[in-house]
């Protein structure tokens, strides 16, 4: 998939998974959230809202003021900017870029959903992804397949999976198979 097509698909899928709301709401963990999964408790919320052209940040945070669609788009772009570089550096050199588009999406989705520290806590999973893709690149396809299945098993037994409902099921399937699952 071309870079622009991949980026558009990533944005579409994350938007479906996270939802898109112009007014503050409480997410599944009770965290004040807005836009496409923006945690309003983040340290950089005031800066991000100002960057998006918000003039009443306190009103937005309290739920009294809504963001415009353009502000939601800009906030998502701001929040997504570091995600791909974080995902790339969280894996062994060359592994992220060698993954299938579906597997790269799973890594991006988890990094977006969990934050950097949350994604980095999946050290065994990341190690298995490194090992699986390295085996695939070396032509050891049976070993790579078995390792990607194991990655899926690790994810499916995590708290992330339990809390992620249909997103977790789709992402585990994509990690195991390397192909897109309908969203």
Regions of interest found by a model, annotated:
Residues 1-2, 8-12, 38, 116-183:
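Long, amphipathic alpha-helical surface segments
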